[in-house]
Amino acid sequence: SVTPIVCGETCFGGTCNTPGCSCSWPICTK
């Protein structure tokens, strides 16, 4: 399995502002 890279951003609305990151509630990963 691939270890997700944490983007250092939290996501409450389901979207992430950091480019290339996706919401894996409650944090953004890529």
UniProtKB/Swiss-Prot annotation:
Single biological process term from Gene Ontology: defense response
Disulfide bonds: C7-C21, C11-C23, C16-C28
PTM comment: This is a cyclic peptide.
Alphabetized UniProt keyword annotations: Disulfide bond, Knottin, Plant defense
Comment text on domains: The presence of a 'disulfide through disulfide knot' structurally defines this protein as a knottin.
Positions bearing the Cyclopeptide (Ser-Lys) cross-link: S1-K30
Source organism, top-level taxon: Eukaryota
Function: Probably participates in a plant defense mechanism.
Protein name per UniProt: Cyclotide psyleio E
Homology family: Belongs to the cyclotide family. Moebius subfamily.
Record Pfam families: Cyclotide
